[in-house]
């Protein structure tokens, strides 16, 4: 399933769609959050 993005409420299948995916698999709006990285591609589809 898709994961809702806290930044704007849109949903993303890949982190690049609208947010960054953390190692936990939860989407966060900024890489400044602990554990977040734009280089971490976690598929949520």
UniProtKB/Swiss-Prot annotation:
The cysteine framework is XI (C-C-CC-CC-C-C). One of its GO terms (cellular component) is extracellular region. It is found in: Secreted. Expressed by the venom duct. Iota-conotoxins bind to voltage-gated sodium channels (Nav) and act as agonists by shifting the voltage-dependence of activation to more hyperpolarized levels. Produces general excitatory symptoms. One of its GO terms (molecular function) is toxin activity. The keyword Zinc does not apply. Belongs to the conotoxin I1 superfamily. It comes from Conus radiatus. Residues 45 form a propeptide. This is Iota-conotoxin-like R11.13. The modification D-leucine is found at residue 43. It comes from the Eukaryota. Disulfide bonds join 5-19, 12-22, 18-27, 21-36. Keywords: D-amino acid, Disulfide bond, Ion channel impairing toxin, Neurotoxin, Secreted, Toxin, Voltage-gated sodium channel impairing toxin. The keyword Ribosomal protein does not apply.
